[in-house]
Amino acid sequence: MAALTGDFGPSSVCLVIMSFFCRLFFIFSFSFLVLIAQAEDKQKSIRALLVTGGCCHNYKYQSKALIEGVAKDAKVDWKVVNEGGSGTSARIAFYDDPNWAKEFDVVVHNECFANTVDEKYIRKITSVHKAGVPAVVIHCAMHTYRAAKIDDWRKFLGVTSRRHDHQSRYPVKKVLPNHPILKGMPDNWITPKDELYIIEKMWPSAQPLAKSKSERNGKEHAVVWTNQYGEAKIFGTTYGHSDATFDDPVFQKMIARGLLWVTGKLKD
């Protein structure tokens, strides 16, 4: 300390040391607060599982468009499972874990496996939803497991469908125009080119929100609906065949609001 002369005496050294530790304390405190804020922000995000894949659709593109579109209206952390290949029958290994949905607030089903008929496998999925895990179901999810003899998946969806009309641009008529999921949907919305699914049965637990009319026979079919399956809220739409539909802002907002609604986070 002999080199410390003049004004740079012991008191100055103490001030320097105190200043250093104050700055260090500030840095650590700030970093800690940032970590807390990030953790809280993470907790506010909806944890969503997207199950996709199977026959007849561009699922890689649709997944990307879905995630980007929903992000305009909802903060969501996604996990995408695309394990079933591109055929009509698959057993996704992800479901083998009895706690497969434990980490998620909602499951989005946009898959197409019409010829999977294994009842035990199907119930691995539906039992978890019936216990309370909400879901959003899109397009060919309604034809998934359609060859199965059991109705568990159909009751989960809220509708039974096994076929569809041709592709066209279908006008959408709101039947519950004040439902919060439909907020922002124009009264005159016409879909991009898509398929109209023929609804054979609307299950008693389901409520149609919007319908479209068949160009073949004029019959109306539900195209947007909600369902209560056990303890879980379900939102569904049969539209979603084309990439253009997934790019459509009205469709994107509807899916986002449906996802928020089933998770209890839709505030307006």
What do these predicted ranges mean?
Residues M1-C22:
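N-terminal secretory signal peptides that target proteins for export/translocation
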Residues C22-V34:
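Bacterial N-terminal signal peptides
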Residues L35-A39:
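Sec/Tat signal peptide C-region and signal peptidase I cleavage site
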Residues D41, R47-V51, Y59-V137, A141-H143:
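Helical hinge/lid and interdomain linker segments adjacent to catalytic or ligand-binding clefts
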Residues D41-S45, K72, K102, R216-H221, ...:
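Extracellular ligand-binding/catalytic regions of CAZymes and related secreted enzymes
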Residues G53-C56, Q167-R169, H241-D248:
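Active-site rim elements
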Residues A71, V76-K79, E103, R162, ...:
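Catalytic beta-strand/loop cores that center a nucleophilic Ser/Cys/Thr
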Residues A114-G184:
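A glycine-rich, often tryptophan-bearing local segment used as a flexible ligand/cofactor-contacting loop or short
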